[in-house]
From Swiss-Prot:
NCBIfam families the record matches: clpP, PRK00277.1, PRK12553.1
Provenance organism: Agrobacterium fabrum (strain C58 / ATCC 33970) (Agrobacterium tumefaciens (strain C58))
Protein name per UniProt: ATP-dependent Clp protease proteolytic subunit 2
Family label: Belongs to the peptidase S14 family.
Taxonomic placement: Bacteria, Pseudomonadati, Pseudomonadota, Alphaproteobacteria, Hyphomicrobiales
InterPro entries in alphabetical order: ClpP (IPR001907), ClpP/crotonase-like_dom_sf (IPR029045), ClpP/TepA (IPR023562), ClpP_His_AS (IPR033135), ClpP_Ser_AS (IPR018215)
First-level EC class: hydrolase
Keywords linked to the UniProt accession: Cytoplasm, Hydrolase, Protease, Serine protease
Length: 210
C-alpha cells in the first residue's frame, strides 16, 4: 500500500518563472525555499530530518542574519530524527520562526515550541499534542531492561527541552506529558508552546518585525 504522503509529494505542482536567461521551473517547495520557507510535513523520520536540516544549513549559508520560517504539519515520529532537526535549529545563526498549520503532535509539538521566542505561531484551527516517548522492544530480558533505561533517559531529556521552551516547571511538564494531551491553539498558547495565534499574513509579519 502506498504511503499517502509519498503519493501527495509525487503530485507537487511546478512554478515557471521568467528570467534573463529564459524560463525556469521549480517545484513549489523549492520556490518557497527561495523565500526562506521550509515545510516539515508528515511523519518525522530520518530522510525527512536530513532534508529539513540540509535546508536550514543552506539558508544559513545564504544569509546568516535573515530569519527562516518553518511550517509544521506533522503527527510526530522518530525521536532521534526530531532531535536532529531540533539541534540544527538551535545550532544555526538565523532565527527560526515556527508555524503550525494542521497539527503538531509528539515531536512536531517539540519542534513547534523550539522556534525563536516570540516567533512561534499556530493558525486558529491547529491542533497540538504532547506526550512522553513510547517504544516496543523484544528480546532477552537484559536487552529489554537496557532499552527501558534508555527510553526513561530520553523522556527526561525531552521534558527538559519542553521546560526550556515553554517556561513550565518540570513537575508541570511531567504531569502533562504523562498521557496524550491534546490542545487547541488557545490552549497551546496558554501552555507556552506558541506565542501567538495567526489569522493573517500581516499578523505574522508584524510579530516577526517586532
Amino acid at each position: 500500500m502506498k504511503n499517502p504522503v509519498d503519493t501527495a509529494m509525487a503530485l507537487v505542482p511546478m512554478v515557471v518563472e521568467q528570467t534573463n536567461r529564459g524560463e525556469r521551473s521549480y517545484d513549489i517547495f523549492s520556490r518557497l525555499l527561495k523565500e526562506r520557507i521550509i515545510f516539515l510535513t508528515g511523519p518525522v523520520e530520518d530522510q525527512m530530518a536530513s532534508l529539513v536540516c540540509a535546508q536550514l544549513l543552506f539558508l544559513e549559508a545564504e544569509n546568516p542574519k535573515k530569519e527562516i520560517a518553518l511550517y509544521i504539519n506533522s503527527p510526530g515520529g522518530v525521536v532521534t530524527a526530531g532531535m536532529a532537526i531540533y539541534d540544527t535549529m538551535q545550532f544555526i545563526r538565523p532565527a527560526v520562526s515556527t508555524l503550525c498549520v494542521g497539527q503538531a503532535a509528539s515531536m512536531g509539538s517539540l519542534l513547534l515550541a523550539a522556534g525563536e521566542k516570540g516567533m512561534r505561531f499556530a493558525t486558529p484551527n491547529a491542533r497540538i499534542m504532547v506526550h512522553q516517548p513510547s517504544g516496543g522492544f523484544q528480546g532477552q530480558a537484559s536487552d529489554i531492561e537496557r532499552h527501558a533505561r534508555d527510553i526513561i533517559k530520553m523522556k527526561r531529556r525531552l521534558n527538559e527541552v519542553y521546560v526550556k521552551h515553554t517556561g513550565r516547571t518540570l513537575e508541570e511538564v511531567e504531569k502533562t506529558l504523562d498521557r496524550d494531551h491534546f490542545m487547541d491553539a488557545d490552549e497551546a498558547k496558554d501552555w507556552g508552546v506558541i506565542d501567538k495565534i495567526l489569522t493573517s499574513r500581516q499578523e505574522m509579519e508584524g510579530a516577526v518585525a517586532n
